[in-house]
UniProtKB/Swiss-Prot annotation:
Protein's organism: Cavia porcellus (Guinea pig)
Segments of this protein annotated with the region Interaction with KCNE3: 239-247
All ranges on the Extracellular side of the membrane: 144-154, 220-227, 285-300, 322-323
UniProt domain comment: Each channel subunit contains six transmembrane segments (S1-S6) with S1-S4 forming one voltage sensing domain (VSD) and S5-S6 contributing to form one quarter of an interlocking pore-forming domain (PD).
Protein name: Potassium voltage-gated channel subfamily KQT member 1
Intramembrane residue segments, as ranges: 301-321
Amino acid sequence: MAAASSPPRTERKRGGWGRLLGSRRGSASLAKKCPFSLELAEGGPAGGTLYAPVAPPGALSPGSPAPPASPAAPPAGLELGPRPPVSLDPRVSIYSARRPLLARTHIQGRVYNFLERPTGWKCFVYHFAVFLIVLACLIFSVLSTIEQYAALATGTLFWMEIVLVVFFGTEYVVRLWSAGCRSKYVGIWGRLRFARKPISIIDLIVVVASMVVLCVGSKGQVFATSAIRGIRFLQILRMLHVDRQGGTWRLLGSVVFIHRQELITTLYIGFLGLIFSSYFVYLAEKDAVNESGRVEFGSYADALWWGVVTVTTIGYGDKVPQTWVGKTIASCFSVFAISFFALPAGILGSGFALKVQQKQRQKHFNRQIPAAASLIQTAWRCYAAENPDSSTWKIYVRKPARSHTLLSPSPKPKKSAMVRKKKFKPDKDNGVSPGEKMLTVPHITCDPPEERRPDHFSVDGYDSSVRKSPTLLEVSPTHFMRTNSFAEDLDLEGETLLTPITHVSQLREHHRATIKVIRRMQYFVAKKKFQQARKPYDVRDVIEQYSQGHLNLMVRIKELQRRLDQSIGKPSLFIPISEKSKDRGSNTIGARLNRVEDKVTQLDQRLVVITDMLHQLLSLHQGGPHSGGGPQMVQPCSEDGSIHPELFLPSNSLPTYEQLTVPQRGPDEAS
């Protein structure tokens, strides 16, 4: 079957090649410049088989050659072999401007999101209407217990139950079918996994039980008495259908789990107060008789009932202590136990308030995520603008429109008006996801080459083949009207129509410079939006930021202290005990740095003295030894002539390095 259908497809594409080559004469030359298959697949000039020409086939210049009659001889450099059909889903490509196909999985996903993940006003209207219907059915069930409205409510309830059973049964089947869009619910076992969810089990029980009650418990159009009781219970279960996501129970469970320690403590102490107060009241009142001659606290169970009614502040008044001892015990334990039994309500209330505030803060934080993503994207685009890679500039190149005339041998002019009406629709997205709509990507246009510029302008051809959306870098031509006026023809000849750039190789330096400027502007705008989104939510956030900053500062100070200890040593290493006892304030960092500077200054002075001494020894060695005996003293002098009398070198001291290394002179040499 595939082999039989391939020849017509090849002939159709070859016919399209012939019309394409007749309208664009520069395709072969551009194809030689872009021989790579990747560039041809990206929508280059050589890969324009699936796109419409800029001018229609009929609008050719007088000097241009006529299209070839037979498409069997393609130009050199272009291989026209049979090409397999492209089976890619356009929803997968980010550069696709077509709307997603209504496939089976796509419909399943939309239905699943509508029923299981309601968002938007349509979902709200649907689920709120279901809630009102279930509530109305419950109201009629209540009215059926009143004798005045029993006849009317029972008949109406019968038909409402039939409608609800059919509706909920159909909805259950649709939910089961739409769950196949998720990977974990695919197939029979996946559907069973979906049916094992608690809310799905409740829906199935309600539907099946309602069908059984309608089939067995009805007599004509009226329910039996036993069936009415079953219907009431099922209507109560239907109220669980309203909250299918279980958000209420999850919220309650999270609050209880967070404050579980406080709740357990208060309930434990309150329970201890309850049993102790009930026991002591029972001991005091077990023999007391009331006015009617009856013992009210005849058992410990009666005392426990009185304790529960008292500590929960209900106070039925059916059992009252009679003796003063019992009243005193009851009053003391009531004040103590009631305070603990009232604490869980306050704990849960504060927990719900904190949970709501946490959700609001999370929403405020979630607003920063798109702003941060936009800032990162624009910063990366500014960095990538210096890269000559073709993928950097691909988003600014317009993909030519798919030609409708290439797919059929005989074009139908009736559809051109429909294409002209719908041409603005796909360009709204421009192949960019909805999250990137904040960053507008302009398309670039350029002047047409001289060899491809026709003598007579065909405005309709441009209008039908090129989709125009005015952007920052594009000048959209105004709508021209052909008339018989010679002056208007002269005005029309002076106009220049801009053709969209369809390949990266057509970009010039001024295009790239303009793109860099636009990207830099988008970066500054995204930075400003991110700074606005980073504003604190309330005063607590400001205090938290300050405390976090203070904590970071203290950590850095401790790290600096540790490095100073490693560099200049700890105070206990070079400070004597006497100084520690005199002044403990000298252990500060400033005092330690001053001591280090003093030590460095002393070392510098000693090095100067040693240097002067070496110079003196060198001069003595070159000038000869001193005459006379006695102790030999070396007085190293500085540049200003100051003598350091603290350094003496007696003759009977140990020999120096110079004395050991320099050879001694003989007596004849000395004379």
